Amino acid sequence: MKLTRILTIGACAAIALTGLNSQTAFAAEKEHAEHKEKTVVPESVDGIMDAIHKAHGDLADVVKSKKLADVHHHAFAIRVLANGLPAKVAADKKARVEGSAKNIAKLAEDLDKTGDANDQAATEANLKKLDGVLKALDAQVK
């Protein structure tokens, strides 16, 4: 009888903890999704690139000031903007710009993870990688 009671309590605790983790993950995803909806993609390539550079500057400031909890807002804004570029560039540039947009999306995820983990060194390293990809993107859209 005692063993059954202990197993029942253990199972209930496991279910409760699983529910808490799911709610926490859902809340984090919802927060990231809400920010994505707020990013407005300009109509022109120049407008998108200006917005990317502004968000990149904001991201660099956030990382420099060690406010890593805010990294994902700026990283995901850059991702949304970069994903809007392939449809706006000339056909001969589209494939390369799509490749850069994929790299930016991966780096945005990496920045989010390292920022959420409060890992300053890894976040700075990912920001440096993003700097290089954005430099290449600048050359691709010209």
Q: Model-found features: residue ranges?
A:
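Short, flexible helix-adjacent loops and helix caps
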Residues: 60-68, 87-90, 116-120, 142
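Short, solvent-exposed, charged loop/turn and helix-capping segments
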Residues: 81-100
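Short, charged, amphipathic alpha-helical segments
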Residues: 71-76, 95-105, 121-132
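Amphipathic, heptad-repeat alpha-helical segments
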Residues: 68-87
